[in-house]
Amino acid sequence: MALHDENVVWHSHPVTVQQRELHHGHRGVVLWFTGLSGSGKSTVAGALEEALHKLGVSTYLLDGDNVRHGLCSDLGFSDADRKENIRRVGEVANLMVEAGLVVLTAFISPHRAERQMVRERVGEGRFIEVFVDTPLAICEARDPKGLYKKARAGELRNFTGIDSVYEAPESAEIHLNGEQLVTNLVQQLLDLLRQNDIIRS
């Protein structure tokens, strides 16, 4: 908060997070999907949201491309803008967790420091880092948006995995093999959510 905002105060809500969670029938949590472009983050997150929806779980999916059409439309891809992009998404995700939702976020989020920033904002026990680990060669072969081709041709600068670093998680809550079938990965995630009493068995 800026120094000139000392008169802005926090207002507590009469309905607590616990009451909202009781209403939904499950805990609020963020599943933070991270990995290279083309690793399968959005695909797996979308499939998991569909599975959770069928189970009656209240969810919301925040996708890296989609938020840049609105919430983060003023940001580019410099290190500073990428950090601000993740900060904003983290704040939105935190609000949704406080509303009792299971929030799925699919962002490359290449730097450990930014992912840690969101973890600390949301709070331990409510942040699940999901590392979708897919070899660069596989991601590049998939290249659904043609971005790797542009990066290799020098038409796209600061592209993660090519000329911009990706810092892989060192202790993610779950490490997924991005070459496996999506259905297998979704089942692994559902098992994790049940084991941690986030959703009912």
From Swiss-Prot:
Task: Give the positions the UniProt entry annotates as the active site.
Answer: S109
| Reaction equations catalysed | adenosine 5'-phosphosulfate + ATP = 3'-phosphoadenylyl sulfate + ADP + H(+)
InterPro entries, per database record: APS_kinase, P-loop_NTPase
Can you name one GO molecular function term for this protein? identical protein binding
Question: Which pathway does UniProt place it in?
Answer: Sulfur metabolism; hydrogen sulfide biosynthesis; sulfite from sulfate: step 2/3
Report the SUPFAM superfamilies cross-referenced here. P-loop containing nucleoside triphosphate hydrolases
Protein name according to UniProt? Adenylyl-sulfate kinase
Per the record, the domain of life is: Bacteria
Record EC number: 2.7.1.25
Stated role: Catalyzes the synthesis of activated sulfate.
> By its UniProt entry, which Gene3D superfamilies does this protein fall under?
P-loop containing nucleotide triphosphate hydrolases
Provide the family line: Belongs to the APS kinase family.
Q: What HAMAP family does the annotation carry?
A: Adenylyl_sulf_kinase
Say which enzyme class the record assigns.
transferase
Keywords for this protein: ATP-binding, Kinase, Nucleotide-binding, Phosphoprotein, Transferase
Q: Where does ATP bind?
A: G35, L36, S37, G38, S39, G40, K41, S42
Question: CDD domains under this entry?
Answer: APSK (cd02027)
UniProt-listed GO biological process terms: hydrogen sulfide biosynthetic process; sulfate assimilation
